[in-house]
Amino acid sequence: MIEKIWSGESPLWRLLLPLSWLYGLVSGAIRLCYKLKLKRAWRAPVPVVVVGNLTAGGNGKTPVVVWLVEQLQQRGIRVGVVSRGYGGKAESYPLLLSADTTTAQAGDEPVLIYQRTDAPVAVSPVRSDAVKAILAQHPDVQIIVTDDGLQHYRLARDVEIVVIDGVRRFGNGWWLPAGPMRERAGRLKSVDAVIVNGGVPRSGEIPMHLLPGQAVNLRTGTRCDVAQLEHVVAMAGIGHPPRFFATLKMCGVQPEKCVPLADHQSLNHADVSALVSAGQTLVMTEKDAVKCRAFAEENWWYLPVDAQLSGDEPAKLLTQLTSLASGN
């Protein structure tokens, strides 16, 4: 229902306009206060890069963060990552992730990013505290990448990158809750790079596609072509589950059942195992896998995806960030 409201297919969005106007006024006032320096943002002693979005829901932001961190690491840059830690609840903040940190403590995306990149990752509702925690433990870090937080103006940033779903784009264009917008589309004029996940990019936008890798068994780590798996039940607890189901079909998999779950939904063995019957194979997203690995069964697999950016702009962006991190 919410997708129909946000896309404008349902007339119910008009009923929510008063709340959207209120949301827009408050969010605009907050940004203006920081812009006019009525409120002071905290500036880190190293450059900060924000990877965020203008809309609620999954846009492919986390794969972009992983891509960015890995690309900078390959260039010899030491990177730290901070996040709000949505879906997690730590005993205290800031929380610096370790091999023992669970998604219940830190949230799905931070654990995924930590496991993928081995970069220092910290979470806190106050992102400046997360930055301070990383720099205290890892003083060699040269640049901070923040996963989400475009609207978290308390943390000063040097570079802003926005990720857009190229198919859904901005829906009906309205602020939450009548539409999907956290900020209006005009905000794109002030960011440094716009990355478009799928669809047809517009002038000045960087095209991106999510490339699936081999399926990975949660228990054994065995890899295989996902099309070799039989009697597949697909599960996705991400911002936009249909994207994952479409990826499976693109890989030649015709799931016997597709199970969309809420983003950041907590998972347990009983609930997940109930999704599959004898002889079926469960295939989930990598984001779900970080929550299920501790209690996984032998017929549970996940499909990792990697961001692939096209054109000349990604190289220019990486050159800019490398120069910033190197102090040039």
From Swiss-Prot:
Reactions that this protein is recorded to catalyse: a lipid A disaccharide + ATP = a lipid IVA + ADP + H(+)
Superkingdom of the source species: Bacteria
Top enzyme category: transferase
MF (Gene Ontology): ATP binding; tetraacyldisaccharide 4'-kinase activity
Keyword Nucleotide-binding among record annotations: yes
InterPro entries according to UniProt: LpxK (IPR003758), P-loop_NTPase (IPR027417)
Keyword annotations from UniProtKB, A to Z: ATP-binding, Kinase, Lipid A biosynthesis, Lipid biosynthesis, Lipid metabolism, Nucleotide-binding, Transferase
Associated pathway: Glycolipid biosynthesis; lipid IV(A) biosynthesis; lipid IV(A) from (3R)-3-hydroxytetradecanoyl-[acyl-carrier-protein] and UDP-N-acetyl-alpha-D-glucosamine: step 6/6
Record-listed E.C. numbers: 2.7.1.130
One Pfam family, short name: LpxK
Biological processes, Gene Ontology terms: lipid A biosynthetic process; lipopolysaccharide core region biosynthetic process
Cellular component GO terms, alphabetical: plasma membrane
Residues noted as binding ATP in the record, renumbered to the chain: T55, A56, G57, G58, N59, G60, K61, T62
Keyword Nuclease on entry: no
NCBIfam families: lpxK
Chain's role: Transfers the gamma-phosphate of ATP to the 4'-position of a tetraacyldisaccharide 1-phosphate intermediate (termed DS-1-P) to form tetraacyldisaccharide 1,4'-bis-phosphate (lipid IVA).
Entries under HAMAP family matching the protein: LpxK
Sequence similarity: Belongs to the LpxK family.
Entry protein name: Tetraacyldisaccharide 4'-kinase
